[in-house]
């Protein structure tokens, strides 16, 4: 059985979280570490935006600051995510890994099997979304809003037809980095408050639409699920779906210095976060 590293970082700053994901990609590309499954949280609660999003156009930055939220641009695509009551995961693995599909969409499905299995471990009837109409496929090419949980993409996880986990992917240096948010709870009004809308009517439409499109774990269970329970369920889910053994990984001081330098140079800088 192949051994991967497993890293549970706990609560970290937004800039450190993104720097560590990129550092893991760098080290794996250089053959210094095996593939990695990482779990983490955010301190403070943070709005992350996709690599291609326009921060000043899409985001109400005054509301972000007024609510004391962190803000960071991800190295991956996709739309904006409010990271608050959730567990975030990342998977770092070479594109040439055995049986890894070349297609971005199919690789996404393979890596997301661990998330699917994690939901099943929690006793939830989750399944992959597959856009089955021309309208849904068109929405993926030209999304109507900047909100990630507005609609599921190919092979994202849904329960009762509603999106419960959103993910994004990038490929650099021959390595896949996929990370995503697993929602425990969803504060709809806080989420809506940090986006710019063309009008109050547009915001009201999203307010009505969101409960039909997105759902969080604790709104579907009788007893609240903790982050610790999620860590166990999804760690075991990845181990089973990828048929791997997970070995705990702790960063060395030298590795921590590398992450902090990358954080300072890139993810903590306005030049990166507001460049579009």
UniProtKB/Swiss-Prot annotation:
Q: What Pfam families does this protein map onto? A: LplA-B_cat
Q: Which PROSITE patterns match?
A: BPL_LPL_CATALYTIC
**UniProt xrefs under CDD domains:** LplA
Site keyed Lowers pKa of active site Cys: positions: 163
Catalytic residues of the enzyme:
148
Q: Top enzyme class of this protein? A: transferase
Instruction: Give one GO biological process term.
Output: protein modification process
Its UniProt pathway annotation is: Protein modification; protein lipoylation via endogenous pathway; protein N(6)-(lipoyl)lysine from octanoyl-[acyl-carrier-protein]
Boundaries of every BPL/LPL catalytic domain copy: 31-246
EC number from the UniProt entry: 2.3.1.181
Question: Which GO molecular function terms does the record list?
Answer: lipoyl(octanoyl) transferase activity
Catalysed reactions listed for this entry: octanoyl-[ACP] + L-lysyl-[protein] = N(6)-octanoyl-L-lysyl-[protein] + holo-[ACP] + H(+)
What UniProt keywords apply to this chain's record, in alphabetical order? Acyltransferase, Transferase
What is the role of this chain?
Answer: Catalyzes the transfer of endogenously produced octanoic acid from octanoyl-acyl-carrier-protein onto the lipoyl domain of GcvH, an intermediate carrier during protein lipoylation.
Q: Partners and quaternary state?
A: Monomer.
Q: What else is known?
A: In the reaction, the free carboxyl group of octanoic acid is attached via an amide linkage to the epsilon-amino group of a specific lysine residue of lipoyl domains of lipoate-dependent enzymes. The reaction proceeds via an octanoyl-thioester enzyme intermediate.
What the record says about family reads: Belongs to the octanoyltransferase LipM family.
Protein name from the UniProt record:
Octanoyltransferase LipM
Q: What organism does this protein naturally occur in?
A: Lysinibacillus sphaericus (strain C3-41)
């Amino acid at each position: 059985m192949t051994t991967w590293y497993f890293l549970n970082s706990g609560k970290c700053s937004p800039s450190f979280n993104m720097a560590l994901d990129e550092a893991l990609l760098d080290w794996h590309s250089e053959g210094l570490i095996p593939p990695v499954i990482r779990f983490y949280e955010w301190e403070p609660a943070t709005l992350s935006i996709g690599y291609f999003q326009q921060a000043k156009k899409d985001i109400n930055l005054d509301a972000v600051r007024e609510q004391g939220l962190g803000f960071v641009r991800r190295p991956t695509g996709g739309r904006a995510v409010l990271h608050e009551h959730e567990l975030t995961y990342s998977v770092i693995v070479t594109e040439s890994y055995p049986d890894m599909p070349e297609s971005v969409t199919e690789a996404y499905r393979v890596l997301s099997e661990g998330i699917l299995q994690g939901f099943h471990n929690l006793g939830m009837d989750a399944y992959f979304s597959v856009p089955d109409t021309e309208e849904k496929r068109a929405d993926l090419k030209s999304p109507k809003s900047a909100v990630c949980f507005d609609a599921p993409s190919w092979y994202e996880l849904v329960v009762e037809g509603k999106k419960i986990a959103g993910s994004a992917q990038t490929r650099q240096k021959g390595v896949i980095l996929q990370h995503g948010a697993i929602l425990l709870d969803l504060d709809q009004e806080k989420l809506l408050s940090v986006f710019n809308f063309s009008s109050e009517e547009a915001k009201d439409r999203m307010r009505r639409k969101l409960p039909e499109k997105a759902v969080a774990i604790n709104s579907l269970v009788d007893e609240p699920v903790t982050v610790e329970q999620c860590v166990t369920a999804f760690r075991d889910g990845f181990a089973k779906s990828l048929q791997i053994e997970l070995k705990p990984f702790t960063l060395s001081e030298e590795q921590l210095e590398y992450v902090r330098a990358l954080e300072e140079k890139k993810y903590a800088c306005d030049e990166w976060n507001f460049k579009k």
